[in-house]
Structures are given as C-alpha cells and as structure tokens.
From Swiss-Prot:
The keyword ATP-binding applies. This is GMP synthase [glutamine-hydrolyzing] subunit B. Gene3D superfamilies: 3.30.300.10, HUPs (3.40.50.620). It catalyses: XMP + L-glutamine + ATP + H2O = GMP + L-glutamate + AMP + diphosphate + 2 H(+). It comes from Haloarcula marismortui (strain ATCC 43049 / DSM 3752 / JCM 8966 / VKM B-1809) (Halobacterium marismortui). GO terms for cellular component: cytosol.
C-alpha cells in the first residue's frame, strides 16, 4: 500500500515541475480517479488549472448537477455541452474498440478547444495502473490511454496517479478531504454508458442504460460492491400486458475486487434480484427482460465492452 502523505507531496511536486508556469486542463468525469487527479493538480498549481467537465450524453443520471455542486470551489470549472457531437461521431459504429477510440478522440478535441481558449499547454489525466496494464496488454483500450488520438495538440500529458490501484486512489481522495460521494463512489468507465451498450449507441439505448444503472447502484449499495452496473446487451421477446414485444435485454453485474485486475461476481439474494428486474422493466416499456451475470474476471472483464 502506498504511503499516502508521501505520495501526495511527490505527486504535487511532479505536477508543478512538469507544468511550471504554464497552464493545464484536466477532464472531470465525476469518478474518483479524475476527481482525485483534479484535486492534486489544483493544490499543485491552483488557478493555472482549468477543470473541464464534458457532458458527453453518456453519463450517469444526475452526473452534471453533481459535478457543479462538488467542484464549485474551483473558479476555473468549465462545463462543456457536447452531447450532440459525441452521438453524431458514434452514429453507426458497433465495434467496441472503435467506439472507445472515437470517444477518446472527441474528448481530446473538446479539451483542445478549451485549452486554446485558456492558453493551456498541458493535459492532466486520472490514468491509474490497471488502465495501463489493460491497454498495454491489448485487453481493451481506455479512453485516456489507448484511446488517445495519434496527434494531440498539447505539449505534454501529466498522469500523477499512473502507478496507483483503485483502493490507493480512494485513500488519496480521503486524505485530500474529498467528499464521500467522490472518494467512495463506484468506478465508472471514462467512455461512460457507451461501453455498457452492446453495438451502436442510440438515444433510446442510453435512456435504458442510464435508468437501469441508477436502479442497480441504488439497490446494491448495501452490498458494498467494488462495482455494480447494468448493460444493454441486445433484444429478446417479452410480454407487456397482452402483447408480445421485442424489447431490450438488460444485464446486471455486481463484483467484488481489490483493484479491478481480478474480480468475483457477488451472490445476491433472490428478493434483491427480483426488485431490480421489476424496477428496470417497469421504468422503460421497451425492456423485455433482465438477467444477472455470474461470470468472474477472468474469464470476463468487468465492463461489457
């Protein structure tokens, strides 16, 4: 386990040394990784940092409002409304890796726009060790690692937490006095709900995935999973009222893990499973069935794409 106080001082020194008297931007997603990296960078360089939250349209329910409230102490916070641009770029794309690359590239382009406006030279990211391992091992790319476009209009990228595991990031977040909603929050992928949708990302699938993930996080909070999620994985026949429907299949997944490198599917009681399926199928008329994923990692990854 990392020595938290020592790490914080070293990370702030690294950030300050790399960026010097120039300006930097950092992307905020609301997750613990990017939030902790932002807090570190803000302590290191203060107003030289512009925190950028890009509303991709791929975020969790209520995410944007939470960002506004949590980071209102940062005068430089910028919220970019980019939902239409992301959905336009993703239209028709079904390949998981291409989706990640499209999202990664669009993220960088959004950052570049803000960076030009504030005359920033550096990009700070919340990349952690498991991100690098999965990307280097070609398990899958991460939007802030393998998903980066080949040409980036920044002088450099600073990744102060690149050697930390998720539980160590949480320790750092607590030491920085970040709110519990940030430090204890379940992991959420950088590409957002796009990797919880098999195939093309559409507004209808996003609406289903967003509400289903909200239900799952609420219902499973007492189980204290390392990560819990819902994914739209395809279509199947169901019955609504007296009519047959060909509706969406939602897969629920809840795992225990220390660092995300390996994970075990949680055993959930029947009443909890039934309550989730009732809420999810009741929230959207086009959801035909809900299934529970019992696969560990390996052989599966935690996310579906």
């Amino acid at each position: 386990m990392v020595n938290v106080d020592e790490f914080i001082e070293e990370a702030k020194a690294e950030i300050a040394e790399e960026i010097g008297d120039k300006h930097a931007v950092i992307g905020l997603s609301g997750g613990v990784d990017s939030s902790t990296a932002a807090a570190l960078a803000y302590e290191a360089i203060g107003d030289q940092l512009t925190a950028v939250y890009v509303d991709t349209g791929l975020m969790r329910k209520g995410e944007t409002d939470e960002i506004r409230e949590t980071f209102d102490y940062m005068d430089s916070l910028r919220i970019v409304e980019a939902q239409d641009r992301f959905l336009d770029e993703l239209e028709g794309e079904t390949d998981p890796e291409e989706k990640r690359h499209i999202i990664g590239e669009q993220f960088i382009r959004e950052f570049e726009t803000v960076a030009r406006e504030v005359d920033a030279d550096y990009l700070v990211q919340g990349t952690i060790y498991p991100d690098r391992i999965e990307s280097e091992g070609t398990i899958k790319s991460h939007h802030n690692v393998g998903g980066l476009p080949e040409r980036i209009d920044f002088d450099g990228i600073v990744e102060p937490m690149r050697d930390l595991y998720k539980d160590e990031v949480r320790e750092v977040a607590r030491a920085l006095d970040l709110e519990e909603i940030i430090s204890e929050r379940m992991p959420f992928p950088g590409p957002g709900l796009a990797v919880r949708i098999i195939g093309e990302v559409t507004e209808e699938k996003l609406a289903v995935a967003r509400e289903a993930n909200h239900v799952v996080e609420e219902e499973l909070e007492e189980y204290e999973p390392w990560q819990a999620l819902a994914a739209v994985i395809g279509k199947a026949t169901g019955v609504k009222g007296d009519n047959r429907v060909h509706g969406w299949v939602v897969a629920v997944r809840s795992v225990e893990s220390r660092d995300g490198m390996t994970a075990r599917a949680q055993e959930l009681d029947w009443d909890t499973l039934q309550r989730m399926q009732s809420r999810i199928t009741g929230a959207h008329e086009n959801v035909a069935r809900v299934v529970y994923d019992v696969t560990h990692k390996p052989p599966a990854t935690i996310e579906y794409e």
